[in-house]
Structure formats: structure tokens, C-alpha cells
């Protein structure tokens, strides 16, 4: 009788152990396993911030010690979620081995003069101000999710105008032109005038149903031009982050999330505008004695994105 009771107790203990192990495994995976919603390859150089937490895998089971503020290569980004917490991780390579680190723990090296100017200034940006107008038609995006899949960049093409004058003109002529964008950006403002939950009508029928769009008035000093570009990069990063999208340049097959109006004309059609190519290149050459292209802008967007 006593032997049977001891056997039953052992069985109970074994069952308790098994149940505990299962619960522990479920708890561990819910708290430490990261689900990757998207990833994309890059070729960047960065510096580890002081106190950066470096891991040997995305599951973050084991911390790794690397020299502080060491230079590393960034070869991939991962958009992850764990326990309802969304974070972006960078896969870095140091001495031939890959590690993982939160993007807030690295600082990208900027090759372009304008990007470097902004980086050394701490990546400044204006706050987003909303003055949503009710006059613009609200139509949903044509994506399966109902959300935008990227951002299209415009410049106004007009000299010596301001955000206020451009917005006034767009509103006054909307009934006849049926053209509008979501947001206007200059060196001091990020002014959102149309709800980004709905499509804009500024880049032709092949782009409008898919992208958030913004316009940039022209700036004429080095500081104001750089700050406008910085605000534009911040806003682009904000929209992409808000919609859980990667930072990738638009491609001929329609992929990618960061587009100029000129790229829409070349790759998607339905429009023939070439902005902001000339505005960027002319201003960069005149004000900074350098060049500025969509590749430089994507690099800057990633820097702002990494801080979010």
C-alpha cells in the first residue's frame, strides 16, 4: 500500500514538472522570441554607441561583449515584435562574425556632406503639425492591407514660394486640378494637410493609390536646404515606421518604399514629372559643393528610422 502511494506521488510530481516545463516554455517564447515581420539587406558602416547591448541572435538569449564605440558593418535590418513590443534590429558584422543590436544603439556613418552635416547636428527635425483640410476627396488605398506601401517625394517647382502660399494655391485650385498631396515640408515645418489614411492625387494614377506624398518648397541657404532635407527624411521615416515598412529605394518592378516623382515617371508611368532630382542636385552643388540623390536620401531616412 505504501509502495503504491509513493508511486502515485512520483507520478503527480512528474506531471507537475511536465506542466511547469510547458508553461515555462510558453512564457519564455512569448517574452523572448521575436517574430520578424520584414527584413532587408543593406551595406552600411556604423559605430556602436556606448553601452550598446549586443546579442548573438535575435532571440536575445545571450549578450555578447564588443568594444565600445567600435566600427562595424551593417548588413541587414529586421523589423521585429516580441510581447507586443515592436523593435528594429540591425545585423552587424565585427571581425567576420554577425551579431544583433537594436538600431537605437548604433550611429550610421554618413558619406554625403549634407547627411553628415545633419548627423553631426544630432539629426534635427521639426514636429509634425496637422491642419487636415476637409476639401480633399478621401479614397482608400488600393493595397491589400488598406495602408500605404511607401512615400513619394515632390518639390513644388516654383521659386520663392512658401508653404502657406503653396497650400493656399492647392486648396483654391483643387476643384479644377484635382491635385493634392498629404504634406508640405520646408526647413521649419512639417505641415500635414490631408489625412494619410487616404490616398493623395499628386503622382498620377499608377502611384496615387499606394503612396503617402509630400511637397518641398525651394530653400536658398545651406542651413535651410539641409534642414528641409532632414525634415523630409524624418517624415519619410515616420510614415514608414508607422506602417511597419522597411527603408528601401523604389525599383523598376514596383518594389521599394522610398520614391521620387521622377522614379514614378520612369518605373510606373502615368506621369512625366522629374522632381525633385534637379532641385536636389542644383541646391546641393550650389550650397554644399556636393551632389544629392535618392541614394543619399534613403541613407538619411534610415538614420532617422533607426532612432525611432
Which residues does each predicted region cover?
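N-terminal catalytic cores of peptidoglycan-degrading enzymes
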Residues: 2-36, 92, 97, 103-205
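Beta-loop motif signature
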Residues: 27-89, 93
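Residues that flank catalytic or metal-binding motifs in active/ligand-binding sites
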Residues: 50, 68, 88, 97, ...
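Solvent-exposed, acidic/flexible segments
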Residues: 85, 146, 160, 176, ...
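Basic/polar, cationic surfaces and motifs that engage anionic cell-wall
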Residues: 114-119, 145, 226-308
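Second-shell loop/turn segments in exported
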Residues: 139, 180, 215-227, 284-285
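Short coil-to-beta-strand
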Residues: 205-214
Amino acid at each position: 500500500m505504501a509502495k503504491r502511494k509513493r508511486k502515485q506521488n512520483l507520478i503527480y510530481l512528474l506531471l507537475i514538472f511536465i506542466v511547469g516545463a510547458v508553461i515555462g516554455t510558453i512564457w519564455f517564447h512569448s517574452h523572448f522570441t521575436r517574430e520578424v515581420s520584414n527584413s532587408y539587406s543593406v551595406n552600411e558602416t556604423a559605430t556602436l554607441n556606448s553601452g550598446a547591448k549586443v546579442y548573438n541572435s535575435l532571440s536575445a538569449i545571450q549578450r555578447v561583449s564588443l568594444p565600445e564605440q567600435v566600427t562595424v558593418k551593417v548588413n541587414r535590418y529586421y523589423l521585429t515584435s516580441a510581447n507586443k513590443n515592436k523593435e528594429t534590429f540591425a545585423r552587424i558584422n565585427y571581425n567576420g562574425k554577425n551579431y544583433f543590436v537594436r538600431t537605437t544603439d548604433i550611429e550610421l556613418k554618413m558619406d554625403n556632406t549634407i547627411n553628415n552635416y545633419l548627423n553631426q547636428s544630432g539629426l534635427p527635425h521639426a514636429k509634425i503639425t496637422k491642419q487636415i483640410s476637409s476639401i480633399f476627396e478621401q479614397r482608400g488605398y488600393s493595397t491589400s492591407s488598406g495602408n500605404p506601401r511607401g512615400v513619394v517625394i515632390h518639390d513644388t517647382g516654383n521659386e520663392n514660394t512658401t508653404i502657406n502660399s503653396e497650400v493656399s494655391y492647392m486648396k483654391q485650385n483643387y476643384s479644377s486640378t484635382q491635385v493634392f498631396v498629404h504634406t508640405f515640408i520646408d526647413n521649419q515645418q512639417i505641415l500635414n494637410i490631408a489625412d494619410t489614411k487616404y490616398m493623395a492625387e499628386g503622382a498620377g494614377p499608377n502611384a496615387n493609390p499606394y503612396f503617402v506624398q509630400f511637397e518641398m518648397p525651394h530653400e536658398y541657404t545651406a542651413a535651410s536646404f539641409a534642414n528641409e532635407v532632414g525634415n523630409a527624411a524624418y517624415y519619410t521615416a515616420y510614415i514608414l515606421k508607422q506602417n511597419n515598412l522597411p527603408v528601401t529605394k523604389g525599383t523598376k518592378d514596383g518594389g521599394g518604399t522610398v520614391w521620387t516623382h521622377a522614379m514614378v515617371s520612369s518605373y510606373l508611368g502615368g506621369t512625366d514629372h522629374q522632381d525633385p532630382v534637379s532641385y536636389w542636385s542644383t541646391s546641393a552643388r550650389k550650397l554644399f559643393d556636393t551632389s544629392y540623390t535618392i541614394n543619399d536620401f534613403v541613407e538619411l531616412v534610415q538614420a532617422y528610422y533607426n532612432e525611432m
